[in-house]
C-alpha cells in the first residue's frame, strides 16, 4: 500500500496557444494517490499481480467554456496481470493483462486544463504519474482507457553459443475508452473502440556487458479514432553498454 501527494507549485498562467479572448488560466491540480497492490504465485507455474489506485483532490475547471472554478477530483485506475511459466528449457512464458483508468464524460481533453473538466462537475479523469504498457505505436496517456493484452516470450536457441541469451516475444493489445463521450489524447468520436496493436520485440545479450534491443509496433485505428485510419508504425533499435 502507498500514499502519494502531488502538490502543484507551478505559477505559470500563460496558454501555450492563446485563444481569442483568453491568454492565461489557472492550471492548479492537487491530488493524493492512494494505492494498494498484491503479487505472488499460485502453485509452481502461475504468477499474479494486481493494483488499484484512487486519485482524490482538486482541479481547476476548463477556462474555455465557462469561468474557471475549483472542482473535486475522484478518479481510479487498476491493473491485473497473470503469467504462466511453461518451465521448459526456453524459459517460455505467457501473460495476460487488463488495465483501466477512468475518464470524464464532459472533458474534451483527457489530461489538460484547457478543454478539461466542465465547471461545477466532479472530475473523474485519472491523471497517471507511473508507467503502464499502452503499446509501442499507439501509447496513449493512461486516462479514459481500458486495455487487454496477451503476450508470449521465449529464448528460442538455448543451446547456441551466440544466441543463447536471445529473447523474442510478442504482445497483442486491444484499446477502448472508458467513457465513450469523454476526452482523449486525440480527436475521437463517441464510439468506444480505439483500435488494436501488435508489438514484437527481441532482446539479445551478446556479451556480459553489451546488449541489443529491437522493438516494432503497429497500431490499427478503431472506429473511435476520428483521424486517418492508416496503420501507425513504431521502430526502435537500442544498444546498451554496461560498465
Where are these regions (language model features)?
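Short glycine/threonine-rich loop-to-helix capping motif typified by GTGT followed
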Residues: 66-67, 182, 226
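Solvent-exposed loop/turn segments connecting transmembrane beta-strands
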Residues: 28, 142, 225-229
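Outer-membrane beta-barrel "beta-signal"
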Residues: 231-243
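Conserved C-terminal beta-signal and adjacent last beta-strands/turns
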Residues: 150-153, 167, 195-215, 240
Amino acid at each position: 500500500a502507498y500514499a502519494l501527494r502531488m502538490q502543484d507549485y507551478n505559477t505559470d498562467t500563460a496558454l501555450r496557444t492563446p485563444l481569442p479572448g483568453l491568454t492565461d488560466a489557472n492550471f492548479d491540480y492537487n491530488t493524493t494517490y492512494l494505492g494498494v497492490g498484491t503479487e505472488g504465485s499460485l502453485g509452481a507455474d502461475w504468477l499474479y499481480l494486481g493494483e488499484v489506485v484512487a486519485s482524490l483532490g482538486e482541479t481547476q475547471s476548463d477556462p474555455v467554456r465557462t469561468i474557471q472554478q475549483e472542482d473535486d477530483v475522484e478518479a481510479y485506475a487498476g491493473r491485473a496481470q497473470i503469467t504462466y511459466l511453461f518451465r521448459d528449457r526456453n524459459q517460455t512464458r505467457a501473460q495476460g493483462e487488463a488495465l483501466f483508468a477512468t475518464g470524464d464524460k464532459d472533458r474534451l481533453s483527457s489530461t489538460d486544463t484547457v478543454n478539461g473538466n466542465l465547471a461545477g462537475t466532479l472530475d473523474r479523469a485519472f491523471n497517471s504519474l507511473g508507467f503502464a504498457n499502452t503499446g509501442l505505436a499507439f501509447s496513449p496517456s493512461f486516462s479514459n482507457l481500458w486495455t487487454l493484452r496477451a503476450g508470449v516470450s521465449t529464448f528460442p536457441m538455448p543451446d547456441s553459443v551466440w544466441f543463447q541469451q536471445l529473447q523474442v516475444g510478442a504482445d497483442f493489445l486491444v484499446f477502448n475508452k472508458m467513457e465513450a463521450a469523454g476526452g482523449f489524447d486525440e480527436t475521437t468520436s463517441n464510439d468506444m473502440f480505439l483500435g488494436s496493436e501488435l508489438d514484437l520485440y527481441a532482446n539479445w545479450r551478446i556479451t556480459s556487458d553489451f546488449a541489443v534491443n529491437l522493438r516494432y509496433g503497429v497500431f490499427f485505428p478503431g472506429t473511435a479514432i476520428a483521424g486517418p485510419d492508416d496503420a501507425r508504425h513504431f521502430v526502435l533499435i537500442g544498444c546498451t553498454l554496461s560498465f
